């Protein structure tokens, strides 16, 4: 089965959401998210973004589906749908099966899991994650959704070429300090 990358912004306490939206507004993080999830080395391919229904519904209608990527929504409530840029499936297993077969096995370069917490947890539990691209925000936002399943003892921090030659650069925007980190899941740890 194919592996995926996970991309997430998280506060100091592991919070990733509050009242159905991101509890912070960091333009540089949004730009990073778009750049990383769209970037392909083979220009004949594109990436897929995999998300849960709540994550899908948190995206403004005018920005759905996320441009330049195949959007796959996991939902037990939405009816199954399929178009060129948007597919609804009822399970992670169904999504991964779809992406592991033609035409997607040949046309999708990277699968990006963009959340939310339940979808992140499921992929981590099923050992489907290769890399984690983490925006670490150095503040607690009293979030109501947390990512609890990240076990950094089973990962190693790697160079994040998408940001700079330094993997530990701290940025600041709107009074918030944050960094972009990249972690590789170590299989036999």
Curated annotation (Swiss-Prot):
SUPFAM superfamilies xrefs: Dihydrofolate reductase-like (SSF53597)
Gene Ontology CC entries for this record: mitochondrion
Gene3D superfamilies: Dihydrofolate Reductase, subunit A
Enzyme class: oxidoreductase
Keywords from the named record: NADP, One-carbon metabolism, Oxidoreductase
Binding annotation for NADP(+): 9, 15-21, 53-55, 75-77, 115-122
Domain DHFR: 3-185
GO molecular function: dihydrofolate reductase activity; NADP binding
Name of one Pfam family that matches: DHFR_1
Enzyme nomenclature, EC number: 1.5.1.3
Catalytic activity: (6S)-5,6,7,8-tetrahydrofolate + NADP(+) = 7,8-dihydrofolate + NADPH + H(+)
Record-linked PROSITE patterns: DHFR_1, DHFR_2
Pathway in which this enzyme or protein is active: Cofactor biosynthesis; tetrahydrofolate biosynthesis; 5,6,7,8-tetrahydrofolate from 7,8-dihydrofolate: step 1/1
Superkingdom, natural source: Eukaryota
Matching InterPro entries: DHFR, DHFR-like_dom_sf, DHFR_CS, DHFR_dom
Binding annotation for substrate: 29-34, 69
A GO BP annotation: folic acid metabolic process
UniProt similarity note: Belongs to the dihydrofolate reductase family.
Purpose: Key enzyme in folate metabolism. Catalyzes an essential reaction for de novo glycine and purine synthesis, and for DNA precursor synthesis.
Protein name: Putative dihydrofolate reductase
Organism annotation: Caenorhabditis elegans
Lineage: Eukaryota, Metazoa, Ecdysozoa, Nematoda, Chromadorea
